[in-house]
């Protein structure tokens, strides 16, 4: 796989590696179905076993039962309009995981709740500061357009 990722929704290759390493709990260089289940469970407690299996099947490009770094990177590559549309849908799905009350905006409380479920140690004040960094309309929340801009900040959309 090419190391030259022209655009991706997480930013730099280093950012993608950090996310991968966070998911790869046992540091074996691959994400197992159990590791994927833990991540999905933290983000969406009502996700079914079938949804987790379907996600693994979709992301496990070589069919070996694991998601390796190259497969993980491939998820974030955006190279043409059709994959850009897919990336926008993926971003919307990610946004929806944070938008717990489904009002189209992520509040500091929602961000804090999700971060806590992921095992992140951050205060509500930390979450408010994160929100403020990308809140371009000053409403104290992040809407989808602000979320999209934040996620694509290191790439040219």
UniProtKB/Swiss-Prot annotation:
Binding, Ca(2+) 1: 24, 26, 28, 30, 35
SUPFAM superfamilies cross-referenced by the UniProt entry: EF-hand
Residues holding Ca(2+) 2: 60, 62, 64, 71
Positions that bind Ca(2+) 4: 135, 137, 139, 141, 146
InterPro entries given in the database record: EF-hand-dom_pair (IPR011992), EF_Hand_1_Ca_BS (IPR018247), EF_hand_dom (IPR002048), EF_hand_pair_protein_CML-like (IPR039647)
Alphabetically ordered keywords of this record: Calcium, Metal-binding, Repeat
Binding sites annotated in the UniProt record for Ca(2+) 3: 99, 101, 103, 105, 110
Residue ranges annotated for the EF-hand domain, each copy included: 11-46, 47-82, 86-121, 122-157
Matching PROSITE patterns: EF_HAND_1, EF_HAND_2
Entry keyword Secreted: no
BP terms from Gene Ontology: regulation of flower development; regulation of nitric oxide metabolic process
Position of the signal peptide: none
Keyword Aminoacyl-tRNA synthetase among UniProt keywords: no
A GO molecular-function annotation: calcium ion binding
Pfam families, per database record: EF-hand_7 (PF13499)
Function: Potential calcium sensor.
Name under which the protein is recorded: Probable calcium-binding protein CML23
Source organism: Arabidopsis thaliana (Mouse-ear cress)
Name of the gene this protein is made from: CML23
């Amino acid at each position: 796989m090419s190391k030259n990722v022209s655009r991706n929704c997480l930013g730099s290759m280093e950012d993608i590696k950090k996310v991968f390493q966070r998911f790869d709990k046992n540091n074996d260089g691959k994400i197992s179905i159990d590791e994927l289940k833990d991540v999905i469970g933290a983000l969406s407690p009502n996700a079914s076993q079938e949804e987790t299996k379907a996600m693994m099947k979709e992301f496990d490009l070589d069919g070996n039962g694991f998601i390796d770094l190259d497969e993980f990177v491939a998820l974030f590559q955006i190279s043409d309009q059709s994959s850009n549309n897919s990336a926008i849908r993926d971003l919307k799905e990610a946004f929806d995981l944070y938008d717990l009350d489904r009002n189209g905006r992520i509040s500091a409380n929602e961000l804090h709740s999700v971060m806590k479920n992921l095992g992140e140690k951050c205060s509500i004040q930390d979450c408010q500061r994160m929100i403020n960094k990308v809140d371009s309309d000053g409403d104290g929340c992040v809407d989808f357009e602000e979320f999209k801009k934040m996620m694509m900040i290191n790439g040219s959309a």
